[in-house]
């Protein structure tokens, strides 16, 4: 169970449940790529070690306002308002680097599932993703006693807006 403790009351003052056709809007037709073929899932420690390699391309799959308050060291942060924009920007920007080792990360791992499948569909050869996203990374790094490579705060979708990663 994952939880956050906030001492000033409830994080959400209103709960709205909506049924959507996709968990994350990507603007892509379901038939254009295979969501069962995703990048390799990396543990927090594997991701942590690989982010220190200058040959590795670390890409933030979150929106620009999320990466502005926090990101991993040396990460490329697309200037995208939406995931729909970010996924296309990454393919276009790095189209000539399809053989390079790519590490993707996002808040909880959902956007990276789609992004890694899309990159593999477009011919990228070595795509990995941080399993469980920044949230899982923060918990594992703290448990292992390692110094985090995440700079700033992790954007959260409640009134706190950001959560420190130690």
Outline where the language-model segments fall.
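Short hydrophobic beta-strand that contains or immediately precedes a catalytic carboxylate
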Residues: 57-61
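Rhodanese-like catalytic fold shared by cysteine-dependent sulfurtransferases
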Residues: 1-40, 53, 63-102, 110-166
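Phosphate-interacting basic helix/loop segments used at nucleotide- and nucleic-acid interfaces
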Residues: 40-50
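Short, surface-exposed ligand- or partner-binding patches at beta-edge/loop junctions that are enriched
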Residues: 105
